[in-house]
């Protein structure tokens, strides 16, 4: 995940992987061990190798150890799945949800080109899907999901 800087659908809420990488140890192409950063949040002077290596796909170094900042797990989360075969409708819905007061923590769009029998969470679908995740306290999540529907 770090080498690819893969953050997933929650990126706009919690940030990218590189935002949470505090330090690393790795081996470069010459076989030399490289260390950068540390185990606590701090400001960096000069080049921030953690940010440079995140997303380098292992071309600069192979990471052998990482120190990361973690976030507390939300009390609950729910994902609203909407069937919509048209890209424009899906993008409109995602845009509306992001600009609303529901404060979504994730969003994803699966276009209908996945074809028939696309399986998501053990449910088979046959068209485009939009997913919007809401996280937080149970009562708050239920209210915000109801606002979206």
Where is each model-derived feature located?
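Noncatalytic alpha-helical scaffold of FAD-dependent oxidoreductases
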Residues: 1-149
